């Protein structure tokens, strides 16, 4: 395990010298398995978890091995918060370098939109600072494709006042309420002001293993306003209601159980557009539930519709950062968990099929208006152009500049390509 940027530089020197395969582990939460490797070494940053808060500048600096719980808890001591994920044992590095959506995205944009600078160790072993005013082209690449360019040993984020508690937690419904829940989602799409979010999940969680629909609510404000905003859902009669006022630093722990570490995993992503046809969602749920029910020990699986407002996200042009998933749509993910390796291929095939059907609601995807594929949710078979769209050419040119030998290639898709100048 490394404990400093100097350790990372020294490790990379040995990797280059002896041509050793390697990967980098931040929080160890990689949905693609990129935080582990066979027949190679892991540059493990988990001993680098220091978080520093500058109360005057309202910034938070987190070392490369931090998880979001570290950031949330430390920032909260000063009444501050920044845009993190929705599960607090996710690594700061992985989520940030791939873009980063969270409950505060509706108000402040993506995690990378609030990233001020990084300290990064390049393939050469050189340690540099990248920001909007220093190594600007590298910073552009880091904001969406950072895993391809080096090991980030420190991140500095803009933080915001978050002294009030937030209203959050799940309402649980039986599947017969799906049409009405979808109608509310369609309404939410029109009336939210960025201070709200809703995650709709299909699952049949143990020990009951009964199919349910979970609606994870978020409202950055008082309880009376929150219950009024979500009143359509309350009127449906949830079978369980665990939503309440909680400290912000507890918010990102609410989904931790659904993102546990046991079993085999398949995580895939796509996009969907609102308004949704309720009958389509009913059909998708039926297919998901039938598949899960027909396999042993798969009840920890989930399909998640992330209704996180995108207005602030699309205020930033797709060419402004390497992240190319800025569009008028929302992310959807499948998270399958099982224990029998004999069905690995079957699960991957089914996941792709289900996501394809859902993503067909986004008919207007294009390389310059948002690709409809969140890189942090992408499986290994998704190509670079599908994630980075029109930005892929510049990324590959920068890859040639900063990592011409493709040292950072584990789990990544970019190929170093020299800039071609046409006279």
Locate predicted features:
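Soluble FAD-dependent oxygen oxidases
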Residues: 1-423
């Amino acid at each position: 395990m490394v404990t400093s940027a100097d350790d990372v530089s020294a490790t990379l020197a040995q990797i280059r010298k002896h041509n050793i395969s390697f990967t980098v582990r931040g929080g160890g939460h990689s949905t693609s398995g990129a935080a582990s490797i066979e027949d190679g070494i892991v540059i493990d940053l988990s001993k680098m978890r220091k978080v520093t808060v500058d109360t005057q500048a309202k910034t938070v600096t987190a070392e490369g091995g931090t998880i979001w719980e570290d950031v949330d808890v430390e920032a909260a001591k000063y009444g501050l918060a920044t845009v993190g994920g929705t599960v607090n044992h996710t690594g700061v590095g992985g989520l940030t370098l791939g873009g980063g959506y969270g409950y505060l995205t509706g108000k402040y944009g993506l995690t990378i939109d609030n990233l001020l600078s990084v300290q990064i160790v390049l393939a050469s072993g050189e340690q540099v600072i990248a920001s909007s005013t220093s190594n600007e082209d590298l910073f552009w690449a880091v904001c969406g494709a950072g895993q391809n360019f080096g090991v980030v040993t420190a991140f500095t984020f803009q933080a915001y006042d978050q002294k009030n508690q937030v209203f959050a937690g799940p309402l649980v419904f039986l599947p017969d309420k799906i049409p009405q829940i979808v109608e509310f989602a369609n309404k939410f799409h029109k009336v939210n002001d960025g201070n709200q979010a809703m995650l709709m999940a299909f699952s049949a969680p143990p020990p009951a293993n009964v199919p349910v629909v979970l609606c994870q609510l978020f409202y950055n404000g008082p309880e009376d306003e929150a219950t009024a905003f979500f009143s359509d859902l309350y009127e449906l009669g949830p079978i369980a209601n665990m939503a309440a006022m909680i400290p912000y630093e507890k918010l990102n722990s609410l989904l931790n159980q659904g993102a546990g570490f046991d079993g085999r995993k398949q995580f895939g992503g796509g996009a969907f557009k609102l308004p949704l046809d309720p009958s389509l969602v009913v059909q998708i749920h039926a297919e998901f539930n039938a598949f899960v029910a027909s396999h042993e020990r798969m009840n920890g699986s989930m399909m998640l519709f992330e209704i996180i407002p995108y207005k602030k996200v699309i205020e930033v042009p797709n060419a402004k950062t390497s992240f190319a998933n800025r569009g008028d749509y929302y992310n959807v993910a499948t998270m399958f968990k099982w224990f029998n390796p004999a069905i690995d291929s079957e699960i991957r095939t089914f996941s792709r099929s289900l996501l394809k059907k859902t993503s067909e609601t986004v008919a207007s995807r294009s390389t310059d208006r948002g690709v409809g594929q969140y890189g942090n949710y992408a499986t290994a078979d998704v190509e670079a152009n599908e994630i980075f769209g029109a930005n892929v050419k510049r990324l590959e040119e920068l890859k040639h500049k900063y990592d011409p030998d493709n040292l950072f290639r584990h789990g990544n898709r970019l190929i170093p390509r020299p800039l071609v100048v046409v006279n």
